[in-house]
Amino acid sequence: LGKKVGETIHPVSLLHSTKISPNKLNDIPAEVFESFVLKKLEDGVRRFHVTPMFFGPTAAILEYMPQRVEVMRATWPDLEVRISPCVVDLDDPGDERMAQILIDQIHASREKCGFTSPSIALVDHGAPRIKVTEVRNHLGEQVRRLLPECEFPQVVACSMERRDGDEYAFNEPLLERVIGTEGFRNEIIVSMLFASPGRHAGPGGDVAKICEEAAESHPDLQWQMSELVAGHDGIIDILAHRFAEGPPSDPVS
């Protein structure tokens, strides 16, 4: 991304990544947003541009980050943070680049497994904000429109998990409830709306376990998880576009 936009890009997590041993990160310690910003503030930096590697407008970006900026601004009143749009912008419904990444990964999975007419379960983590699920559903609609129905008979957008309570029913259907339904009993490609591997999306992760458990109840089931989004070069083009959209935006207040 840095090469694409001609700037130095710092890979920074919002939370948690400092728990990972540097030994697993080529001996480069992970950094998280608040401590990174504070360190740069002490070095004299006052302006920051955040390009989110988030598919949709999560509470982390819309609520948590602005709250932390407000706290830091109490000590550093001239702190300025601008945030680019997320990877998928629902205000630009004609942008099919993210859907095309998913489609490329679907085709690669189909070729790898030799499937003839697989159904597609497009799965995300499952978020407590309906706007994030709207992104999932939007991508599902785009993928359905762009894939030939004669080769891919069904496309269903679903979530890996959801919170309890009717107020989170918008995350339905869950992946575990999709597998085994009509059209999802034989060849299935699980299209992974996940950026990178971890305890959910990695080998032996939660998504794989859901598929493995479903296969025990459906002996004809053949399934394959697609590669993850960060492994596709196209994500760099999208992030570069979002980066370019960042500077004109209003600073976080």
Positions of predicted regions on the chain:
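Extended amphipathic ligand-handling, pore-lining, and cofactor/metal-binding catalytic surfaces
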Residues: L1-S253
